[in-house]
């Protein structure tokens, strides 16, 4: 597999994770996520030992949705966890976890930083997604873009500074609120994937000097 193919595959994983945080799973998305091609994708992802448990939870949840009621329950989980903004939710914005303020504001420093990154890459948050730019879905979508358009050093810096720096805190909050465990599994998978990607992107230490 060429480096171009590897980067494309990495981008697909980031795009998938981004989509799961961007909106609730509807009927059409469920069909896509449980299609034959998707099953092969999940299977391939689960071969990595550190990803297996999270992938299995995600797959079992998606494959277990057989009626509208169960699908609506998953949609309700998404809304309750990410859209309500109470102590029983886990807002997916970097600003809320990286700010030193007691009551951090949305559209803060991390939002401004991400907006600048997007502007430099001639990208923008779509109008149908009216969220601050430091939303996890935006960051993961941007990383998918970087996989195919930027040097490894740029990708590594972005992951370490803008993503890995707060994901663990987000997961800690999310796991306390997520009774059904689907979105916790998605978040844990995201962190494990990011950690693995960072390890791959870090320059190898010289054997001799």
UniProtKB/Swiss-Prot annotation:
It is found in: Cytoplasm. Keywords: Chaperone, Cytoplasm. Its main location: cytoplasm. It comes from Shewanella baltica (strain OS185). This is Chaperone protein TorD. Involved in the biogenesis of TorA. Acts on TorA before the insertion of the molybdenum cofactor and, as a result, probably favors a conformation of the apoenzyme that is competent for acquiring the cofactor. GO terms for biological process: protein complex oligomerization; protein folding. GO terms for cellular component: cytoplasm. Belongs to the TorD/DmsD family. TorD subfamily. NCBIfam families: PRK04976.1.
């Amino acid at each position: 597999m060429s480096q171009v193919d590897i980067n494309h595959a990495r981008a697909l994983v980031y795009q998938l994770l981004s989509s799961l945080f961007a909106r609730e799973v509807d009927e059409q998305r469920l069909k896509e996520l449980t299609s034959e091609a998707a099953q092969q994708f999940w299977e391939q992802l689960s071969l990595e030992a550190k990803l297996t448990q999270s992938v299995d939870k995600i797959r079992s949840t998606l494959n277990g949705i057989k009626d509208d009621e169960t699908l609506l329950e998953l949609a309700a989980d998404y809304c309750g966890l990410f859209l309500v903004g109470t102590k029983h939710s886990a807002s997916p914005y970097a600003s809320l976890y990286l700010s030193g303020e007691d009551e951090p504001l949305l559209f803060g420093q991390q939002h401004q930083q991400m907006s600048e990154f997007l502007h430099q890459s001639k990208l923008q948050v779509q109008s149908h997604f009216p969220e601050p730019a430091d939303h996890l879905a935006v960051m993961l979508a941007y990383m998918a873009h970087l996989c195919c358009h930027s040097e490894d050093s740029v990708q590594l810096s972005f992951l370490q500074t803008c993503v890995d720096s707060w994901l663990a805190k987000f997961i800690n909050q999310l796991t306390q609120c997520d009774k059904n465990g689907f979105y916790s599994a998605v978040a844990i998978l995201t962190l494990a994937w990011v950690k693995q990607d960072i390890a791959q992107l870090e320059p190898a230490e010289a054997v001799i000097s």
